[in-house]
Amino acid sequence: MGSWIPKLLLLQLVLLLTKHADSSSIIKYLPGFEGPLPFELETGYIGVGEEDEDQMFYYFIKSESNPKTDPLLLWLSGGPGCSSFTGLIYENGPLGFKVEAYNGSIPTLVSTTYSWTKVANIIYLDQPVGTGFSYSRNPLADIPSDTGSAKRVDEFLRKWLTKHPEYFSNPFYAGGNSYSGKMVPVIVQEISNGNCIYGKPQIRLQGYVLGSPVTDYDLDRNSRIQFAHGMALISNELYESMKRTCGGNYIFVDPLNTECLELIKDYDNCVSGIYENLILVPKCDLTSPDCHSYRSMLSDYWANNESVRRALKVVEGTTGRWERCKWTLQNNKDIKSSIPYHKKNSIQGYRSLIFSGDHDMLTPYVGTQDWIRSLNYSIIDKWRPWMILDQVAGYTTTYANKMTFATVKGGGHTLDYKPDENSILFKRWISGQLL
């Protein structure tokens, strides 16, 4: 009889999880924030995949302007395996952490001034499954892949909109940064293709927005050498020698090309002390409140507090320790390059905003410019500064395929280094204004 106990417990767990599938809740209070939230927050799960086995967790925040007509934006974080809470709390959401030494209590939340929710409704989605609070009810599920996750996101959106039909008429955009540069163009294609299938709920797809996007592994990595030279991190002599000896390929070097390998060692010695996310920021002790990256630790303290999980309506027992970025998450990176998807999206007439922090060395702006030029579209608004209060905030150009490229002066790999400038950039673009 004892052999039935584990099976009975498993059955009870399955029934519990099934009961909580496709749930949603309006959250009025959050631990760490004083008083009621000054915006409308909804959290919940949407089941996708076979028998809804993948339960995708989301945070939805209504626009503070006119939620009935303002755009609906899906925002994804990078990784893969980084929770979209990263975007909500650090980059473009209405809440942020007060940066102070952690004393064992719940970190303090404060309102921000740069939230994109001032002009858009935003869904922050934890994907792929296993990221953040998203989980699978099937412990034997296949390892997620980029293309498979894109299909899951499309399914999520159509189900979410079916449960929130008041947003079907809102213009829809997909967005994200970093590794989302691989995912978002594919998701746009999945949505576009799905809209052509009779009987599927229609999504009013308009375009997409990407910050410092990972696009093509070889191109992104190789462009770091050109960027380092332009930023005076390596000498002109080393740069010219690397170009001549390595032939522009610095990633998969022929092991017989020993001269190139030696030059790459010299390059590594020059840049090893540089913080690649933002080369202006010093490398520092992550446990020090003076370190910019210290804030990422606060989200771990906050999201792993039981009162926080209860407030967010996280289903008990579905996830272990919450990690902002689950770097151990297994994922099949089967999209080598998203450039072909950008090409197809351009042909289909979707708008796009591609922007880069000009001091980001992980995915340098020079590499992003290279793949944009490879699309071979004519320029309709030539390279020029874009301004905030009569000061140069970056540079921009627009192409005939409705693609706008912009740099953010002094910006890094993620939006949190220049949140105000990124917010103004987005607000102008989403409303159809010139930058």
Swiss-Prot record:
MF GO annotations: serine-type carboxypeptidase activity
One Pfam family per UniProt: Peptidase_S10
Keyword Repressor among record annotations: no
Localization, UniProt: Secreted
Active site residues of this protein: S178, D360, H413
InterPro entries cross-referenced by the UniProt entry: AB_hydrolase_fold, Peptidase_S10
Glycosylation site residues: N103, N305, N376
Keywords of the record: Carboxypeptidase, Disulfide bond, Glycoprotein, Hydrolase, Protease, Secreted, Signal
GO cellular component: extracellular region
Predominant subcellular localization, coarse grouping: secreted
Leader sequence residues: 1-23
Example GO BP: proteolysis
E.C. number: 3.4.16.-
Superkingdom: Eukaryota
Tissue expression remark: Expressed in seedlings, roots and leaves.
Disulfide bonds: C82-C325, C246-C260, C284-C291
Similarity comment text for this entry: Belongs to the peptidase S10 family.
Job description of the protein: Probable carboxypeptidase.
Protein name, per record: Serine carboxypeptidase-like 16
Organism: Arabidopsis thaliana
Top-level taxonomy: Eukaryota, Viridiplantae, Streptophyta, Embryophyta, Tracheophyta
